[in-house]
Amino acid sequence: MSCSGSGADPEAAPASAASAPGPAPPVSAPAALPSSTAAENKASPAGTAGGPGAGAAAGGTGPLAARAGEPAERRGAAPVSAGGAAPPEGAISNGVYVLPSAANGDVKPVVSSTPLVDFLMQLEDYTPTIPDAVTGYYLNRAGFEASDPRIIRLISLAAQKFISDIANDALQHCKMKGTASGSSRSKSKDRKYTLTMEDLTPALSEYGINVKKPHYFT
């Protein structure tokens, strides 16, 4: 039985429709990864061979590669590790720790107080040449009130040392004056020197004290 030209095989129609050129069907988005796979990708580093993020980092794609190529200044500050502690306040770059009070200029030298303690104990049984009442009187006139007798005796010792140095300098000037005048021919161990104002004036000038010989009136 012959078939007319208008007739078509119903089974061949779908095949011809499939082979005919046409727009490509839209590609569906990949399904979301399971939670276990996402956890593995997050835990594995990008540089680990065979890790889930290795392909993305090697290919230059993905968030890990973008993070690696990001400039250092745009990255966040590196957090302090759990084992390390933040530098204390007052620490400087060379590793020397300075107290905050020392950084403000309140620098106090550390001196051993043992010799001073022994010296103060000796002052309790020492009687200076200048009486304590005299030293205390002039301290009160200067506006300083010392209740500790050891402080008064310490100031008395300082005054004695100052007067002794001036007297020794005046004596040296007197000896030099006697040597220059030629009176050193008669050498005697029992010779006594009389200090005058001419001997005291140059000795005091060395300490910044200027004195003048008083005028003599007849």
From Swiss-Prot:
Residue ranges, compositional bias (Low complexity): 1-21, 29-39
Cell compartments where the protein resides: Nucleus
Modifications the protein undergoes after translation, according to the UniProt entry: Monomethylated at Lys-189 by SETD7, leading to increased affinity for RNA polymerase II. Lysine deamination at Lys-189 to form allysine is mediated by LOXL2. Allysine formation by LOXL2 results in release of TAF10 from promoters, leading to inhibition of TFIID-dependent transcription.
Phosphoserine PTM positions: 44
Region (Disordered): 1-85
GO molecular function, one term: enzyme binding
InterPro entries in the record: TAF10 (IPR003923)
Residues with Phosphothreonine modification: 48
Name this protein carries in UniProt: Transcription initiation factor TFIID subunit 10
Organism annotation: Homo sapiens (Human)
Gene this chain is encoded by: TAF10
